[in-house]
């Protein structure tokens, strides 16, 4: 039996993986961190550099990418070592910060997705007046509130140790030298569940409404297309089609987030009421499903957004350093804006 810290009383037990499984785990988990960092960096760079992408929705997407980027930089590399080795080698202080960063950035992602669902609902249901309702200023307020609430919640619980109130004996029993755990007591886990559940209900309801409206609009356009005078698509129809496409892509991003998060949240609630009975390997799988979500959004954008693929080519090829590259037209006529 190998310990995290030899010759130290109360040391955690180190994982007993043989070399090949250990190398595979490092490769798989490390790949997730690299995708989260460089994929989201591409999203941020594209939106901030190309003036055509300076829209309220895209600023929300850029801030969401920033949260996922920070997960890839400050959380995933350290969690990779902890998950593979079974040990925390980065000190008690950074253990607290790691937990705070983890929770802050993940909840920031959730709140951003909720704001994006509101933005898409307004855009699809009322595309012509949308630009006057959801402005860049409104987007900025949404971004500020998303970051404020997520950071305040996380640091007020985990940095102060409030998460351990009432379960001190259990925490002592679970604690060993070389570990980094942050169990939530029953009160805080319920708040955590509500912070996840309420935005989720809002998102599911709004995207449900979006797709109902989109279906009605599609039928209306099909009906008007059969009329002789409808030889060309009207401006309103083009705008509606563009907004539906954006809503569909961002709806997929929301669905991916919920699928990644839901098992972890359910397990966290069960654990708090069952004295943390979840086996370590199950917990690690659930945590990494959440982490890997930070790498998924750039892949979703690359698959569904032609403008993002074009932006990637310009960034990777270095053409963004050319004069006036920020004014490059990323959209084809038929694609419309993202």
Curated annotation (Swiss-Prot):
Pfam families tied to this protein: 7tm_1
Compartments it resides in: Cell membrane
GO molecular function: trace-amine receptor activity
Residues in compartment: Cytoplasmic: 49-58, 119-138, 209-246, 305-338
Record InterPro entries: GPCR_Rhodpsn, GPCR_Rhodpsn_7TM, TAAR, TAAR1, TAAR_fam
Extracellular side: 1-23, 81-95, 161-186, 271-283
Keyword Repressor recorded: no
GO biological process: adenylate cyclase-activating G protein-coupled receptor signaling pathway; G protein-coupled receptor signaling pathway
Entry keyword set: Cell membrane, Disulfide bond, G-protein coupled receptor, Glycoprotein, Membrane, Receptor, Transducer, Transmembrane, Transmembrane helix
Keyword Transmembrane helix on entry: yes
SUPFAM superfamilies: Family A G protein-coupled receptor-like (SSF81321)
Disruption phenotype annotation: No visible phenotype. Decreased low-density lipoprotein cholesterol levels in the blood. Alterations of gut microbiota are also observed.
Binding site for spermidine: 102-103
Membrane topology (UniProt): Multi-pass membrane protein
GO cellular component: plasma membrane
Annotated tissue distribution: Mainly expressed in neurons of the olfactory epithelium. Also expressed in the intestine.
Homology family: Belongs to the G-protein coupled receptor 1 family.
Domains (record comment): In addition to the well known disulfide bond common to G-protein coupled receptor 1 family, trace amine-associated receptors (TAARs) contain an unique disulfide bond (Cys-12-Cys-176) connecting the N-terminus to the extracellular Loop 2 (ECL2), which is required for agonist-induced receptor activation.
Stated name of the protein: Trace amine-associated receptor 9
Organism: Rattus norvegicus (Rat)
